[in-house]
Amino acid sequence: FRRVGPDSDPDLYWALRGGGGNFGVVTSFLFQLHEMQRDVVTGYIAYPLSEARQVLNFHAEYSQKVPDEMSIGAGLGGRLGDDPGVGLYFVWSGDPAKAEKYIEPLRKAGTVVFEKVQTMDYVAVQRSGDIDDTRAFTGYMKSGFIKSVSSGLIDAVVDNFEARPDRATRFVITHSGGAIGRVGNAETAFAHRDANY
């Protein structure tokens, strides 16, 4: 048995934190947790597809200004049978009394056609989408990491999305950065720490 950590057997510690497989059998973990309240404020605000460029450009700018307590994603798509649109989804994990200050600007990103904001247990938020959409069992996804969302990228995404005849197609921009970006690229086997999306 070996006990590994940042100061004891650091190469094996690095490998066990995402460097691949076949480095050994881990029999126990010691985790350092960060304090967080159980409930978070989460929601989704939808806008017409015709405002996709405007909303995605807003997201690209605003997501870089919010504090670590807020993560904002953007997406194009819709449930089967619904007209596609553009939406912003978010989680606020800070003081619930301060959430509205950061949510209100989202309502000004475009013409709101749907809004749902609620307080939820963060485990329920983490699981949302796992079983709600049966298409997930037969879907196909590709992804990558980028440092910024340019207007050229937004134009390409919207143009290609609008050209898709299958309205089950979705496009999602997931907001990273924050504490994730303050870990050096060489500190773990996950080397995309400088990607904001």
Can you name each region flagged by the protein language model?
Residues F1-Y197:
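Soluble FAD-dependent oxygen oxidases
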